[in-house]
Amino acid sequence: MLKRLSPFLILLVFTIPGAFADVYIDNEYKYIENDGTLHIVGEIINESNKPINQVEVNAVFYHDGNAVYHTSTENLTSIIMPEMKGAFDLTVIEYIGDIDHYTLDVSFKIAQPKEQVIEITSSEFTQGPVDNISIQGTVANNGEITANMVKVIATLYDRDGNVVAISQTNTKPDYLRANDESFFVIPIMDKTQADVIVDYSLLAESEEYTAVPEFPLGSGVLLVASLSAYIALTKNPSMITRGLGYLSNPKWILSRLR
């Protein structure tokens, strides 16, 4: 009996730790809102070759070497496909006293794959009347059946690529028929973080489907450039006037073509 089980046990020893090593928390960041709510935001990387679900982030907070508070949160999408990322926003509303440091770990289960057919087809930053920032865009269902409970999650980054906030929304209505497209708006509610945001990435999923693979790296560079220009122009509108003046000047255009 032992001889029959030993190959299985050896396989178990080498495969399960490997799966856990390929799923990890990355790029986490802690901040406190104006109302005192503590946030820890970050990404969950799945570098394994299997989809995972029931992904949970567990946090332990310490003071003077003693654990003083435990809490947990779930990944904001129901599944993370191989070579894809998840996002989490762990919040602590109550006062937990002075904290020296915290630790995070992640737990998950191997899942059945979902079709990757929910696609973000367009997106852009917008600025509201009271200087609040939002992301608006369109999401498409490239599947063969209706997608229900469609949601879009935004991971927001600073200039150095660090995660600084997470936000999400459901489409309205929250279903999307096959080969149809819907509009979405993701508000960036925390103004303390809005000042440092220069880039974002988006994930979308439904109960039936998950997101198509992310944009290639080059698209991210374009997003950074676009947002930097957006911020510069909103802070210095005269740049627009000068730019339009140059474009309406034939001599200036010809000098740039030589």
Q: What feature does the model see in each segment?
A:
Residues 44-49, 139-143:
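Asparagine-centered strand-capping/turn motif at beta-strand->loop junctions
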